[in-house]
A protein has these predicted regions:
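Cross-family detector of peptidyl-prolyl cis-trans isomerase
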Residues: 1-158
Length: 158
């Protein structure tokens, strides 16, 4: 079925990232799996948020409908198909940072990353569906979607 293929495609992509030496693994505290990250900028501040802290972040989240295809491609119908979907981004809100409580307002994978980041860090993180929106999905995000975020941790809000 389409869903099975979609699930397999997403799991295969995450496995590919997991096997890549460019990325580092972090186990989720929930025990439901791991995320992968690549450091883009090293904040080097030594300040890491706790589960209960509120943080200020800039981020962009995206996924692909078909991981084997380019970000955009010409479909069988001859039309341009937008394959890479940005589903949420502070860039679309005038780069106003978002504030979240690390442990209670975020999907598991995002929360896991934040607890290992230092203020000033900018990471690319890959989240498997188990630590994202699960089998049911949310809004534009279908169930079993592997998610990618670029996150910049600006501050721990006191």
């Amino acid at each position: 079925s389409f869903d099975d293929e979609f699930k397999m495609d997403n799991e295969k992509q995450f496995a590919k990232i997991t096997a890549s030496s460019e990325y580092t693994k972090i186990e989720s505290q929930s025990g439901n799996g791991h995320i992968m990250y690549k450091e883009i900028t090293d904040g080097d501040t030594g300040e890491t948020p706790y589960f209960t802290d509120q943080v200020s972040v800039l981020y962009t989240g995206w996924f692909k409908r078909y991981w084997t295809q380019d970000d955009t491609f010409i479909g069988d119908d001859g039309n341009l198909f937008k394959n890479k979907v940005i589903f949420d981004s502070t860039a679309d809100r005038n780069n106003v940072p978002s504030k979240f409580t690390v442990g209670s307002e975020l999907i598991d994978g995002f929360s896991t990353a934040l607890q290992h980041m230092e203020v000033g860090d900018k990471w690319e993180i890959w989240i498997p569906w188990q630590l994202g929106y699960g089998a049911s999905g949310r809004g534009d995000i279908k169930g079993y979607s592997t998610l990618v975020f670029e996150i910049e941790l600006l501050e721990i809000v006191k």
